[in-house]
Amino acid sequence: MRIVTVISLMLAVPDAATASGWYRRALGATELWNLGSVIGLEVQGAPFFLAQPESNRWESPVVLGTTTVRVEVFVDDPDTFLSGAAAAGAEYHDPIRDHEMPWGTHRQGGFFDPYGHLWLVGDKSPLRRPA
């Protein structure tokens, strides 16, 4: 069995349980496991994690007043994905629109979640390898 390398992220949130509920409603995330202050989630097979940053020398974007990472999600239907986040209270960063790229048209837009994290949502075209 080949194990694929996965790069994931852990998002700082003030309350992991509350944040988990939001991501499940907004993004259709499912919970992998729950340790209380640290929770594993996945969206369409892509894992990510939530943690309360208590005494860990890191902080949430809301506390810092800025974000240093943008979360990029590549899905089959970015319009529906972004609409679900907006319906759950996400703040639009950029509506889904077509971007002309060297490989063709790429549909992408974005939102800020309630915890200050910037999410860009696009189709899977950047993941395709040229023939």
Outline where the language-model segments fall.
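Vicinal oxygen chelate
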Residues: 1-10, 20-112, 122-131
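Short, surface-exposed ligand-recognition loops at beta-strand->loop->(often short) alpha-helix junctions
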Residues: 11-15
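Conserved ATPase active-site switch/coordination loops adjacent to the nucleotide-binding site
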Residues: 115
